Amino acid sequence: MVLNQEKLAKLQAASRTGGKGTPRRKMAPKPKGPGGEDPKLQAALKKLQVEPVSGVEEVNMFKEDGNVLHFAAPKVHGLPTSNTFAVYGNGVDKELTELVPGILNQLGPDSLASLRKLAESYQAMNAQHAASQAAAAGTKDDDDVPDVVENFDEADKKETEVDKLD
């Protein structure tokens, strides 16, 4: 029986299960679920003796640049006696315009100033848009009518002078 030495070597290498030179099996990574909270965070919260605050649907933190750090369904722990709260979850940077309808009751005096600026800029933008539309509509109508170049009274006088000369 004649066997190809290369095929035989491949079969032997594939059947090898242990010993020196064999590759190690890789462990499948375990997926971390939403319950996998940071142990350091939990230890720090335990030192502060904070308790979980339930019923918090969203948290909005207003920045100085006018943007809002928005947490949808965050986890909140707090100790009201020491005015200490921990908010953690996935925070997203959003502009104030994205949250305007539902955020009006949360605005304080500092944020009302930025809301006024936002409203003024929005009105100015609408005015510019309306002016550009009016200008565009006005230029369409003017294309059909030629511009008046000379005075009709002077042209009429010139014609009467020409008629007199003839």
UniProtKB/Swiss-Prot annotation:
SMART domains on file: NAC
Coiled-coil stretches: none
A GO BP annotation: protein transport
Record region (Disordered): 1-40, 129-166
Cross-referenced Gene3D superfamilies: Nascent polypeptide-associated complex domain
Biased composition (Basic and acidic residues): 154-166
The entry's keywords: Cytoplasm, Nucleus, Protein transport, Repressor, Transcription, Transcription regulation, Transport
Compositional bias annotation for Acidic residues: 141-153
Subcellular locations according to the entry: Cytoplasm; Nucleus
Residues of the NAC-A/B domain: 35-100
Database matches in PANTHER family: TRANSCRIPTION FACTOR BTF3 FAMILY MEMBER
Family to which this protein belongs: Belongs to the NAC-beta family.
Role noted for this protein: Component of the nascent polypeptide-associated complex (NAC), a dynamic component of the ribosomal exit tunnel, protecting the emerging polypeptides from interaction with other cytoplasmic proteins to ensure appropriate nascent protein targeting. The NAC complex also promotes mitochondrial protein import by enhancing productive ribosome interactions with the outer mitochondrial membrane and blocks the inappropriate interaction of ribosomes translating non-secretory nascent polypeptides with translocation sites in the membrane of the endoplasmic reticulum.
Assembly description: Part of the nascent polypeptide-associated complex (NAC), consisting of EGD2 and EGD1. NAC associates with ribosomes via EGD1.
Protein name: Nascent polypeptide-associated complex subunit beta
